Amino acid sequence: MARYIGPKTKIACRFGELIFGPDKAFSIRNSSSSRRKKKTSEYGIQLREKQKAKYIYGVLENQFRGFFEKASRSRGITGVVLLQLLESRLDNLVYRMGLAKTRAEARQLVSHKHITIDNNVVNIPSYLVKPGQIIGVRERAKSLEIILDNLIRANHNKYSWIEYDKSSMSARYLYIPERMDIPENIKEQLIVELYSK
């Protein structure tokens, strides 16, 4: 399956929530939709939750399964560890820092070699950042309008596990967030049940 690049509103309406962030068209389409909902099977509910998580984090099936397998081999609750791994992805942390409006935009910044880890350029969006590492903006990218505009609007104190330094346009990944800290509306246990079949 290829990465979805179609209208985000259509997907958000399917799940009945703003999984991609603010969307003016969402409330209009969602309120005007009067389709009768069919009763969904247990498998359907679990599959839907997995698809929602994949859309939110912009991860394809093979990668998502790889994260699940890694989580299932780890100590701790598999579903929680899965979300913690997704939260530790470089593209997600660039998004959480406020350098990008969306994770898709963050992925582009990473792929175009605008982002560094401990002063080394990393262009792999799925790179897993370790606590203590510093995510920065490459010197030549610090004047990019898209980054500057996003930083003006960003709330740098929103996530306690990211310590942002305005002067250097960088942030330290302090610690892996607990489940209660992760704001995404995902029922991770349903995903665990789906993969455990």
Curated annotation (Swiss-Prot):
GO molecular function: rRNA binding; structural constituent of ribosome
Pfam families: Ribosomal_S4 (PF00163), S4 (PF01479)
Ranges in coiled-coil conformation: none
One GO term of the biological process aspect: ribosomal small subunit biogenesis
Top-level division of the source organism's lineage: Bacteria
Keyword vocabulary terms for this entry: Ribonucleoprotein, Ribosomal protein, RNA-binding, rRNA-binding
SMART domains hit by this protein: Ribosomal_S4 (SM01390), S4 (SM00363)
Gene3D superfamilies assigned: Ribosomal Protein S4 Delta 41, Chain A, domain 1, RNA-binding S4 domain
CC terms in the record's Gene Ontology section: small ribosomal subunit
Annotated S4 RNA-binding domain residues: 88-150
Disulfide cysteine pairs (residue numbers): none
Lyase found in the keyword field: no
CDD domains: S4
InterPro entries cross-referenced by the UniProt entry: Ribosomal_uS4, Ribosomal_uS4_bac-type, Ribosomal_uS4_CS, Ribosomal_uS4_N, S4_RNA-bd, S4_RNA-bd_sf
Keyword Protease recorded: no
Subunit and partners: Part of the 30S ribosomal subunit. Contacts protein S5. The interaction surface between S4 and S5 is involved in control of translational fidelity.
PANTHER family, per database record: 30S 40S RIBOSOMAL PROTEIN, SMALL RIBOSOMAL SUBUNIT PROTEIN US4M
Family: Belongs to the universal ribosomal protein uS4 family.
Function: One of the primary rRNA binding proteins, it binds directly to 16S rRNA where it nucleates assembly of the body of the 30S subunit. With S5 and S12 plays an important role in translational accuracy.
Name the record gives this protein: Small ribosomal subunit protein uS4
Species assigned in the record: Azobacteroides pseudotrichonymphae genomovar. CFP2
Lineage: Bacteria, Pseudomonadati, Bacteroidota, Bacteroidia, Bacteroidales
